[in-house]
Structures are given as C-alpha cells and as structure tokens.
Amino acid sequence: MLDILEGVEEYNNIGALMGIEGLEGNEELLGALRRMNPIKRLRTLSKLASTGAVSRGSRAEMEKHFGELPPHIKEALGKGELRLADTVIYSIKPVSSKTIKMFETQDDKEIGMRNVSNAKLPKNQAFLVSGIVLLAGVAADLTKDKVMATQFGALENFAPIVNGEFSLKSNKKQIVPETSNNVFKTSNMHNVPLGYYKLANPRLIHDDILMEMTIELGTMDGLDQKTHLFVGLHGTITTP
C-alpha cells in the first residue's frame, strides 16, 4: 500500500484508483499513513479526499473512471509503472462497400495507416474515448503509398458519407449506437477541430478487447472509387 501511495500524488480521485471508499476499517492504509511524515500525510489525505475537479479535459474524464479500471492497471498507475497520456487511436480504410469496418482483426499496425493491431489495445493499456474524428479524402491511386499520402478533409463534400451512420463498440457493448455522420460536419464551427465529435458520455476500452467502429452508407452514388476514410478516437490512455 505504501509504495502505491507514493506513486499516486499526480492524480485526482485516487480513492477510486486505489479501490478505497474511506479510512474506516482499512488497516493497511491507516498503517501506511502513520509511517509518513506529517506533511506528506496531510498531502496524501488531501488527495484521497479530492473529487478530481483540478484536472481538465480528457484526463479529468479518465480520473472519473478510475473505479472501472482493471486491478492490474490500477496497481501499475499507483506504483508509477503506468502513466496517463493523450492519444489518438487512428485507422484509414477504403470506401469499397456500403459497410466500412475501421478496425478489423486482420489489421497490422503500420505508420500512416493505423496505430493498433488486430483491433485491440496492447496489454496494460486502457483507453478512455473522449471524442471521435471522421474525415474523408480521395487517394491519387490505390497503391499503399498514395493512400498514406491522401489529404483528408471535411465530410461536407462527401454527401453519401455525411448521410450515413456510424457506431462504436467494445467487447460487443455499445459506446456509441447508430448515429448520423452529420455530427462530424464541423466546417462552420470555428471552435471545434475539423470532423470532431465530442462524446457527452466517454467510455473505457480495455486492453486485449475487440473494438469495432463501423460506418454504414445508404448509397455510394457519386463517390470516387478511391475514396478513403480516416477515423481517430481521441482520449486518454495508460502507457509506460
């Protein structure tokens, strides 16, 4: 317990991180507190009582979900073996049919195409999805190098995509149910990144669990056969 207490000071809501609701009956925690010098004891007690109001953005959202983290990740965060970091989990896929699966089990991690393999996070990584970016572009041709060099932009010029739907799941559980792609039309919103949809209900994706982001189109009429989609899941992740 003492080694965990020494590693959690950078976080808010550490009571949830450590899996404790209070001091009563927690002899291990009380013993660790007694062994601290008075200044450190006061600082630790203050952190234990914190509601997480100091942190902002995706990090604050992650701290609110500490109680949902697996025990091994909680322990590694407490010991300082894992930290919280900003990230975007991304993937590029061709619009070759009305159903586009942005993360698939046969995918390999490759710079410029995607940064996860097999549609799963690596071991010891938990990821809180705070927002989603969806962009479209037309590659010069269908070779991998040209696809990687595609300039992705707003969906407004791709009406069949705008009028389609998307869903996001993890371990077969809905994070975002079928929702109109119109939410990614942000060209006229000067305070919102291009193609960014902020989730009002952020959700965790756990390590080694299948994640599925599916784009469904009603029609492909008018789309260039070289059209590709870029999706980015923005949020906070645990990392060494």
Model regions and ranges:
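Beta-strand-centric surfaces of beta-sandwich/beta-rich domains
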Residues: 1-240
